[in-house]
């Protein structure tokens, strides 16, 4: 028996716009030595058919900046560290790939984040502030958030996929 696709989801909800990938997914996709590279590639492959049907995997400003920054970090990348122009070229090649798009931050993301911050039941620690923003961007754009970080389950997201290694 084969395992279900990690990208499996009802076709109707896929029609809502695709996925907003967390930085950890983009990084795992491009760095072969990353411990989650295999899982990220499986997710990417599982979404191939959806991309041909017009569904997209999205960057946003936070994930674009984060990917370029991390690819240039010697402590993270070791001997594979990149210079800024090379890291930017990797981002650009991903952005130009079929089925990859850019989700623009909107005022509705601000409103979503504000509602979550004022919701005492969420009790968001400061360490999740960037995650809260990414979740708000996904929710306000009707995108499914995809991450390796289980902390995203804390947010009242309509659609979230937490990948496992």
What label would you give each PLM region?
Residues 2-4, 14, 97-146:
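Active-site neighborhoods of divalent-metal-dependent phosphate/nucleic-acid chemistry enzymes
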Residues 152-158:
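Short loop/helix-cap segments at secondary-structure boundaries that form the rim of catalytic
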Residues 1-59, 71-86:
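Short, well-structured N-terminal submotif of metal-dependent ribonuclease cores
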Residues 89-92:
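Acidic, glycine-rich loop-and-strand cores that form catalytic or ligand-binding grooves
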Residues 22, 127-128, 149, 161-165:
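Histidine- and aromatic-rich ligand-binding microenvironments
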Residues 59-64, 86, 109, 130:
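Short, conserved alpha-helical segments within structured domains
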Residues 20, 57-60, 102-104, 145-147, ...:
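A structural signal for short, well-ordered beta-strand segments and their strand-loop junctions
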């Amino acid at each position: 028996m084969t395992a279900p696709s990690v990208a499996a989801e009802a076709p109707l909800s896929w029609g809502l716009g695709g996925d907003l990938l967390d930085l950890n997914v983009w990084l795992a996709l491009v760095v072969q030595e990353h411990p989650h590279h295999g899982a990220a590639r499986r997710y990417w492959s599982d979404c191939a058919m959806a991309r041909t049907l017009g569904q997209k995997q999205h960057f946003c400003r936070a994930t674009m900046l984060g990917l370029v920054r991390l690819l240039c970090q010697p402590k993270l990348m070791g001997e594979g560290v990149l210079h800024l122009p090379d890291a930017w070229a990797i981002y650009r090649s991903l952005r130009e790939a079929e089925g990859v798009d850019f989700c623009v931050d909107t005022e509705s993301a601000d409103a979503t984040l504000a509602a979550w911050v004022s919701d005492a039941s969420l009790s968001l620690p400061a360490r999740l502030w960037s995650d809260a923003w990414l979740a708000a961007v996904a929710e306000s754009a009707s995108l499914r958030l995809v991450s390796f970080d289980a902390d995203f389950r804390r947010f009242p997201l309509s659609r979230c996929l937490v990948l496992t290694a």
